[in-house]
Amino acid sequence: MDSLCAMAPSSQNMAPDTQLRVENSQGLALSSHCHEVVVVGGGLTGLVTAFMLRQKGVDVAVVERENRIGGQIHTYHEGDFTFESGPSTSALSHPEVAELFELLDKSTLLKARKEAHARWIWYKRNFVEMPHGLWSGLTTPLVTLYDKFRLLAEPFRQRGVNPDETVGEISRRRLGNSYFRNFVDPFVSGVYAGDPDKLVTRFALPKLYALEQTYGSFIRGAIQKMRTPKTERDRLATKEVWSCEGGMERLIEQLADGIGRERIYLGVTSAVLRPEGKDGWELRGVVTTTEDAMLDVSELSTACDEHLSDEKEMQTAKNNFVCRAQRVITTCPAYALPQLLSFVESSLLKDVSTLTYAPVVQVAVGFKDVQGRSFQAFGGLVPSTAGRKVMGILFPSSCFSHRAPEGGALFSVFMGGVRHPEWVEASDEAITETVLSELQTMLGLPRDLQPDLVRIFRHPRAIPQYEASSVERFAAIAAIQSQYPTLTLAGNLRDGIGMSDRIKQACGL
């Protein structure tokens, strides 16, 4: 810790997480913070990372730009409606998710009702349920007769040789055009809000890519994996859809409590990181927290600089933030890294920060009474060729309890994506009118049935797109981390975009 707190004569004898205080002739107190590890970014990845480190007894702090934690996760409660402005569900696709809730409060984990197993696809003029067995697969109108027969030969097709083959290319090659059009394309819109002909399979859908590369076939690989004995830990990855009791923000609150809220510094803007000494780091920023912030960092995060002398400098310094650490983990978006890591070679930063993000408009629509109508499914996805103005509609109140009043319904509607980015700039009136029209047409809601809730959330840079440029991005990340072994670049710029992916990555940092 000597190199981290060198400004204090006896810093080697001080406990971690110490505020060092100095005074000038005017008696103005300044402070600086020292931790073993600093996590930059208070979204899900950053919070789980800090929580897991605290479980190991590591002295860790979280630095967040906004005056709230959670990143895109934000739960709202209005009347009897509970809705999200960001991700609302995920799948138990990794054991780390179940293990995390074991460490927190198991009762927080809310598994979806059985209705969530049903998924709808818009086909011609109606929603059609996706097949979930042999018979439904043979009879579904979503796949042409030609492609149904063609699928029989899938186990015998050769492996792809292009490592940058896109999701669209591999699915058409192995499955056929109708599978691509009615399954893969809407799935990619629902997960990435992206274009399957731009997303590289080995980055965007690594498990699918591994099936072909390891077993030579999707079908053969899936069968082989089902036959492979699973460990007790493997069985924790049940693939079930999950959320949290009371909304996703409950998870954020529990993580904050587990970390220790005094270790979370909010409202730190203009953050700049720089190497300090042989094996240390210094993070400087400006504290812009408000009084009603979730954590009071006005007391916890002010600057420490022995060389400030006059009153003007001291007054400015009161708003500064300094934190020193032995290790730094960044979990912030790729576009925030050039300012934060200005000491890194510009060519490497460019390869990391040019990551493309899909813009998404998310609209919560609630009805207190849907006049007996039932929507027994997880939701409906829309192929890009269908000519609709929405990418998909989720049914949170069908999947989870207490999302809407009894007899009512809550819908989460998604628009925009890489194909229609213009929606993020559209007016509230245009979005509302379009969404209600689509709900009426696609779900059969009466035109005289007025919603009791409409809330619009715009996310100009919502979802990272794992396109061909990911090769350069991952190489640049590896080069930076090799040059600076105590610096880790994490977050959804690599290792997957879903909440379960974020939890898995964080548990391994």
Question: What is the meaning of each model-derived region?
Answer:
Residues 35-62:
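N-terminal Rossmann-like FAD-binding beta1-loop-alpha1 element of flavoenzymes
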Residues 75, 98-120, 178-182, 357, ...:
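A short alpha-helix-loop-beta-strand transition element characteristic
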Residues 153-273, 280-281, 287-313, 324:
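Active-site/ligand-binding neighborhood in enzyme catalytic cores
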Residues 79-159:
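Dinucleotide-binding Rossmann-like beta1-alpha1 core, especially the glycine-rich loop
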Residues 45, 68, 335:
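Conserved Rossmann-like nucleotide-cofactor binding loop
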Residues 54-77:
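Glycine-rich FAD pyrophosphate-binding loop
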Residues 17-18, 31, 56, 266-411, ...:
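Mid-domain catalytic core of redox enzymes
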Residues 3-4, 17-20, 24-31, 131-135, ...:
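Conserved flavin/dinucleotide-binding core of flavoenzymes
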